[in-house]
Amino acid sequence: MVPPVQVSPLIKFGRYSALILGMAYGAKRYSYLKPRAEEERRIAAEEKKRLDELKRIERELAEAEDVSIFK
C-alpha cells in the first residue's frame, strides 16, 4: 500500500472550506426550490382532477347519447 502524502494545511483548509460552502449553498438552494416544487405538484394535481372530471362528464354524455330513446 502507498503511504499517505503530506498535504499542505492551506490546501486542506481550502478543500474543507469549499466543501462546507458547497453544503451550505446546497441547503439554501434546496430550501428555496422545495416550496416551488410543492406548489407545482399541487397545481398539477388540481389540473389532473379537473381534466379527469371533464373526461368523466364527456364519457357520461357519450353514454347518454347511446342510450337515447330516439334511436
Curated annotation (Swiss-Prot):
| PTM-bearing positions, type Phosphoserine | 68
Pfam families named in the record: ATP-synt_E (PF05680)
Source species: Rattus norvegicus
Protein's cellular compartments: Mitochondrion; Mitochondrion inner membrane
Q: What is this protein called?
A: ATP synthase F(0) complex subunit e, mitochondrial
Q: What is the lineage of its organism?
A: Eukaryota, Metazoa, Chordata, Craniata, Vertebrata
Q: Name one GO molecular function term.
A: protein-containing complex binding
Q: Which UniProt keywords apply?
A: Acetylation, ATP synthesis, CF(0), Hydrogen ion transport, Ion transport, Membrane, Mitochondrion, Mitochondrion inner membrane, Phosphoprotein, Transport
Q: Which residues carry this modification: N6-acetyllysine?
A: 34
